From Swiss-Prot:
Residues 73-108 are annotated as: Framework-3. The modification Pyrrolidone carboxylic acid is found at Q20. Residues 20-44 are annotated as: Framework-1. This is Immunoglobulin lambda variable 1-51. Disulfide bonds join C41-C108. Residues 20-117 form the Ig-like domain. Gene3D superfamilies: Immunoglobulins.
Length: 117
């Protein structure tokens, strides 16, 4: 059986159009089915450093789905193959036991305290 790698495409950066808050992700990650991948999200002290991080999965033609909230919590129905962590101004999404259905866009998101009025 031939295993072809999955390509997990990622948002390169999340920005508010009226703000200068940027979260940086790698452009893509690929791995074979059954393997593990980690997806990084880098920010600053005003966003990731002092706020909770969420992760979203967007399959082609569908709305984004919440995978992780409050850094490492999973909503009901999200398998434990998905995990989140945060350290300093960076966050990571881990996916174990990759499946073909995991091929999607993945987004990190957080609040930026510097945008508070």
């Amino acid at each position: 059986m031939t295993c072809s790698p999955l390509l997990l495409t990622l948002l390169i950066h999340c920005t508010g159009s009226w703000a200068q808050s940027v979260l940086t992700q790698p452009p893509s990650v690929s791995a074979a089915p059954g393997q593990k991948v980690t997806i990084s999200c880098s920010g600053s002290s005003s966003n990731i450093g002092n706020n909770y991080v969420s992760w979203y999965q967007q399959l082609p033609g569908t709305a984004p789905k919440l995978l992780i909230y409050d850094n490492n919590k999973r909503p009901s129905g999200i398998p434990d193959r998905f995990s989140g962590s945060k350290s300093g101004t960076s966050a990571t999404l881990g996916i174990t036991g990759l499946q073909t259905g995991d091929e999607a866009d993945y987004y990190c998101g957080t609040w930026d305290s510097s945008l508070s009025a």
